[in-house]
Amino acid sequence: MNLVLNNFTYTSFIKKKISKPKNLKQLTKLLKKKHTIIGSKRSYGDSFIGNYSNISMLNFDKIIDLNTKEGIIEVQSGTTLDSINKVTIPKGLILDCSPGCKYVSVGGMISNNISGKLSNKNYIINKIISITILDKNFKLKYCSQKKNRKFFKLVIGGRGKVGPIISAVLKLKKINSDKIVQKAYHFNNYNDFNKNIKLIKVNEYCVVWINFLKKNFSGLFLCGNHLNYKGSLKYKNNDFKLPSLILSILSYLVNTKTFTILFNCLFRLSNFIKREKTVHLVDYYFPQNKIINWNEIFKKNGFVQFHFYFEKKNLLKIITYIKKIFDENKLYSNFAILKFHNISKKKNKLSLSLDIPIKNNFKLIKKIVNKIVLKHKLEVNLAKDILLNNLNNKTLLSNNIFEIKNKK
């Protein structure tokens, strides 16, 4: 069946057949032709949209085993994070390195080496014990940090190029409660930001919202910690869909600067009035999923997310430059989030994601983003990218961080 396949941000479309094998025999047959492996289609970029047949792994959705004593779960690659949480949260377990969307598949998380809100070891690779894939000879291949280690690292962040992931064994965090205490810390300049940077060492979770509408360097540290005392352990799902009429009305407003100003002001105000609050961990991990179809608000024009990595010493210089060039070209970011990443003991990096609404200016956005990347030699997350002209193939398998080289 031919379907119109689109990415999550409605910026890439292709009319192709989607095959959904139910077992290894059917999967092997499909793999003999040129193909692209897809999961839940939640990528912001175009990395899962190929020119050949599309193979969905969503029928490989079984939870194979759960060891509550050791905090270990084995799942098939098509299992969604939401399905895992339904089972693990009532048992006092959680995958604490989780992306902002709970409807992603395990295979998608691993193939993109996703990051979460953790202050330390903020990549899914740190939670993976082992992976089983179907290799180029159509044989099941087991790999881990100890066995087939090189292969293991190629699979993580490899976007299905090494072979489809069949299953994975993941390490879960033990929790006493389904609640997280979130605290907001405001800063109004770069010196304040530096004073608060110590927060990443004393909190389990920490991200930074940056006010991209102001010329000065201001924003919020949003820190979180699990409640230590025993409490309720319930899964929560009060997600809902917006009706078509509301989506249609919002689609005319969402890509305007007025909407962006209002949204960011309300976000800042809500965290200023209530600087400390206790929330359910599902609401903390996945705030955007309260509205299941929120991305359809952007269906009319789409939006892009520019997600890049850099060293902390360059933070102020990069953000100042981006704000300046955005202002000169009448571009703006709906939402800006800064994350912390420990690549190794000697290598610590930050990442910044900017949601940029499209208003018949996609070519301009692409031109400006490429200029920023090349000027500051940034690294990018291809799961979010649809803007870049050229990649350096030497870094293609560097665990989800891809360096850009100048286009000749």
Residue ranges and their predicted role:
Residues 320-325, 365-373:
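Short amphipathic alpha-helices in soluble, non-transmembrane regions
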Residues 8-103, 112-118, 338, 378-385:
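Glycine-rich N-terminal segment of FAD-binding domains in flavoprotein oxidoreductases
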Residues 111, 129-317, 321-324, 328, ...:
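C-terminal substrate-binding/cap subdomain adjacent to the FAD-binding core in PCMH-type
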Residues 292, 363, 374-408:
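Activity-critical C-terminal alpha-helical subdomain
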Residues 45-64, 116-138, 164-171:
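Structural signature of FAD isoalloxazine-binding scaffolds in flavoprotein oxidoreductases
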Residues 304-308, 349-356, 389:
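Short, hydrophobic beta-strand segments
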